[in-house]
Amino acid sequence: MNRRDVLKIAGLTGISFGLQPMIGSSSRAALADEIETPLFLSVHAGGGWDPTSFCDPKGRADETSPDPVNHYMIDQIRTPSASSPIRWAPMGQNEAFFQAHYDKLLIVNGVDTSTNNHSTGTRYLNSGQLEEGHPSFAAMLTAMVGPQLPLGYITNGGYDITRGIVPRTRLGSLGVISRVAEPDLDGDRLFNSDPVTARMDMYRAERFGRLKDAQQLPKLQRGLLDLEASRSGQNELKRLNENLPDLNRFNTSLGQQGAIAIAGYRSGLTAAANLSVGGFDTHGDHDNRQAAALNNLSSGLMEIWSEVERHGLEDRVLIMVNSDFGRTPRYNEGNGKDHWSITSLFFLGAGVRGNRVIGATDEGVNALPLNMQTLEPDPQGQKLQPTHIHAALRARFGVDQHPLSAHYPLLTESIPIFG
């Protein structure tokens, strides 16, 4: 094959040399109509939320209580029923969120992050490792499920370090995806009709086949096959475009982020995604600002779950919601709350036995030690740490059996939080 033939093939495929193909030929089996594992959505409440304003409420006995954890009263704390362990603070839209979803929630309180640093806490809660140099769980899951998936790991922020085990995709503009997926669309008009486009594709494929068959060198044949596979990425983006809902019907950015990830999963392109919402670093005017951030979070989660239910994916999507750390059990001089190492997180969706709470804190928001087998408070037990949560996550998805787990060990055994 001479240089002219190679350039002809490059033109036929629409790919420039020096670029990695979107999908290698070895990954075709990974592009099934349905990915075997549930879609994992990691939702990050950026800035450090206050669990006592949400899922681990601490009220004051009366208005004369000195140095209260919160301004609301103990008797204002809400619960869905006398038999439910789930309780929530009387702030913002907490009532609507918990009443709608308490039976699906697994809340984990009293998690000791051992840090007040934003980046360290975010890393620990999303990788299970306190020190630097470890990929997020979402990246490890994607590497196991299909590292060559075109949009395998979508990220909108939070801890999205991959350590090179899998690419990550930031979807900054869905308009670009639509233009690549539907290059013949010009507004509402077709530049080429479907029959014309189909005939062009047929001639292009026939010509590509002739050029490929004329090449005998195995290395160049493999390169041509990769180019052909890269060109097929346009069809996969078209699938995503077809599965995307009208994003204008979502009232929150978080809801839109979740809808895009769900569309990617339904298209067989996405295994995991980072979603994010901010506003939780409330060093001043804590009650008002924390309530506003929690409203944004809970509204977005309700939109995401509505999308999950719309597609019948209740047992195919697992959502984990966490933050950087918690906030102090007292107000500062600016009526705000500062950083605190004890926090909470929760799960919703596939494989979660709901209406449950694991872990606890005392009235000073200090983590209580647990028996790691029964998960009940035990003075002789251990404090719950993010590494315990991630050991359970790895076991839940089978990541603990993947070689990456040996390369990035957690040095702790799994605990039965999903059992």
Regions of interest found by a model, annotated:
Residues 1-419:
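Ligand-binding pockets and gating/stacking loops
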